[in-house]
């Protein structure tokens, strides 16, 4: 009977009919879950979240070390040197990672380490001068992130076309200003601890105006990051591109945090 069943099955298939064995096989295939990105080695939202968490893990770990260096009287000088080295390293690696065709996890995590070195020391010094300011900056950053995510998901807020080009030009101009300001501070041309940001115009520190514009630019950049990540997932990009999404998101969040921290410091410094 087994032989007859097999033969009849072959004959049925040969004449375009479906045998009982084929029916069972098809039912199993239809019952199986459809292939998702993770099954095909494609980028998923979870991939981006995990890699972003890894980057912030590195930032926090390294930042804790440089925080202690910068806030300890015995090692504060070393802490400042590490902060400067971290800032330069983050700038260089940030540019390298931005222009690489393929994301490099090693270089991206190295960038996170440099950011941690800079952020830890900078945050520690600010916390010593203005207790509670770091928590305020963190909460402010999270609030902006939550608002922009809600605007993107619920209200359909997008930054594209002409608006995106204007934003990129504005960010380029801001980068040039920041580099010039940094050089003026390092060389001692400007004595104010905030550099050109400490200049007062009509009684208002220039740093507040520039900082507010920077926060708006960073917030809009978050929307662009969200859209870039969504496109990557929908197009089924390889998993390695989740590192690119995590890198872009981390860069924007760090920028946003620094700007909010600086604004708060300027405001509290005027008290």
Provide a role label for each language-model segment.
Residues 1-271:
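A hydrophobic alpha-helical transmembrane-helix feature that marks the membrane cores
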């Amino acid at each position: 009977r087994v032989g007859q069943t097999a033969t009849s099955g072959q004959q049925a298939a040969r004449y375009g009919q479906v045998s009982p064995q084929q029916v069972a096989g098809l039912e199993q295939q239809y019952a199986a879950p459809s292939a998702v990105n993770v099954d095909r080695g494609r980028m998923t939202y979870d991939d981006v979240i995990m890699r972003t968490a890894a980057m912030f893990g590195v930032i926090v770990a390294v930042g804790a070390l440089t925080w202690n260096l910068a806030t300890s009287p015995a090692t504060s000088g070393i802490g400042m040197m590490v902060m400067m080295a971290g800032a330069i390293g983050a700038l260089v690696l940030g540019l390298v990672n931005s222009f690489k065709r393929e994301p490099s996890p090693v270089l991206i995590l190295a960038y996170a380490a440099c950011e941690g070195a800079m952020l830890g020391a900078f945050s520690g010094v600010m916390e010593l001068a203005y207790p509670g300011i770091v928590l305020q900056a963190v909460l402010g950053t999270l609030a902006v992130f939550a608002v922009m995510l809600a605007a993107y998901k619920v209200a359909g807020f997008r930054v594209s076309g002409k608006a995106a080009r204007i934003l990129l030009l504005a960010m380029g101009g801001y980068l040039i200003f920041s580099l010039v300001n940094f050089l003026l501070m390092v060389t001692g041309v400007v004595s104010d601890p905030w550099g050109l940001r400490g200049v007062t115009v009509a009684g208002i520190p220039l740093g507040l105006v520039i900082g507010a514009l920077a926060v708006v630019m960073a917030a809009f950049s978050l929307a662009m990051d969200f859209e870039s990540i969504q496109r990557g997932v929908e197009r089924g990009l390889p998993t390695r591109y989740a590192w690119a999404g995590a890198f872009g998101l981390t860069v924007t969040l760090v920028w946003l945090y620094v700007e909010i921290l600086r604004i708060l410091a300027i405001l509290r410094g005027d008290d």
